[in-house]
UniProtKB/Swiss-Prot annotation:
A motif (Gly-cisPro motif, important for rejection of L-amino acids) lies at residues 137-138. It is an enzyme of class 3 (hydrolase). SUPFAM superfamilies: DTD-like (SSF69500). A Gly-cisPro motif from one monomer fits into the active site of the other monomer to allow specific chiral rejection of L-amino acids. It holds the Pfam family Tyr_Deacylase. GO terms for cellular component: cytoplasm. CDD domains: Dtyr_deacylase. It comes from the Bacteria. Belongs to the DTD family. The lineage of its organism: Bacteria, Pseudomonadati, Pseudomonadota, Betaproteobacteria, Burkholderiales. This is D-aminoacyl-tRNA deacylase. An aminoacyl-tRNA editing enzyme that deacylates mischarged D-aminoacyl-tRNAs. Also deacylates mischarged glycyl-tRNA(Ala), protecting cells against glycine mischarging by AlaRS. Acts via tRNA-based rather than protein-based catalysis; rejects L-amino acids rather than detecting D-amino acids in the active site. By recycling D-aminoacyl-tRNA to D-amino acids and free tRNA molecules, this enzyme counteracts the toxicity associated with the formation of D-aminoacyl-tRNA entities in vivo and helps enforce protein L-homochirality. GO terms for molecular function: D-tyrosyl-tRNA(Tyr) deacylase activity; Gly-tRNA(Ala) deacylase activity; Ser(Gly)-tRNA(Ala) hydrolase activity; tRNA binding.
C-alpha cells in the first residue's frame, strides 16, 4: 500500500462543484492499494503515517507527527501511484489493486483513521476529483508498506 503525503497549510477536494473534504494545517495523503494488499498493510501504513514526524518542533526540526500537532488528515484515493512506468510512454496499472479490493481497502483505511485520529476528511473513490492544496515547505514523502510474501 502506498501513501504520498504532503504537509499542507490547507487542502480540499471538490466533486461536481461541491467541496466534499477539507482540512487546515496537516497532511494531504494520496492513497493507493496494490495487488496483494490486505488490512494488515493498511494498518501498518496508517500507523506509520500518523506517527511520521514531518512537523517542526520548537527548535525547527521535523520531530512532530500529525497526531502530535492535532493536524488534519485528508485521504484521497489515487490508484495511479501504483503505475509501472519502466517502459514506453504509457503507464501500466497492473500493480494496482483491482477496483473492488482498492475501494474496500480505502474504506477500511478511512474507518481506521477516523477511530485513531481527531480530524479526518476524504475524497471520493472513483470520482473525478479536483484536489487543491497549499504545500507547506514543500514537504512531501512517499510511504509504502509491501505485503509479506
Amino acid at each position: 500500500m502506498i501513501a504520498l503525503l504532503q504537509r499542507v497549510t490547507r487542502a480540499s477536494v471538490v466533486v461536481n462543484d461541491v467541496t466534499i473534504g477539507a482540512i487546515g494545517a496537516g497532511l494531504m495523503v494520496l492513497l493507493c492499494a496494490e495487488r496483494g494488499d490486505t488490512p494488515k498493510e493498511a494498518d501498518a501504513l496508517l500507523g506509520k503515517l500518523l506517527a511520521y514526524r514531518v512537523f517542526a518542533d520548537d527548535a525547527g526540526k521535523m520531530n512532530r507527527s500529525v497526531t502530535d500537532v492535532a493536524g488534519g488528515v485528508l485521504l484521497v484515493p489515487q490508484f495511479t501511484l501504483a503505475a509501472d512506468t519502466c517502459s514506453g510512454t504509457r503507464p501500466s496499472f497492473t500493480p494496482a489493486a483491482a477496483p473492488e479490493l482498492a475501494r474496500s481497502l480505502f474504506d477500511y483505511f478511512v474507518a481506521q483513521a477516523v477511530q485513531r485520529h481527531v480530524q479526518v476528511a476524504t475524497g471520493e473513490f472513483g470520482a473525478d476529483m479536483q484536489v487543491s492544496l497549499t504545500n507547506d515547505g514543500p514537504v512531501t514523502f512517499w510511504l509504502q508498506v509491501k505485503p509479506a510474501i
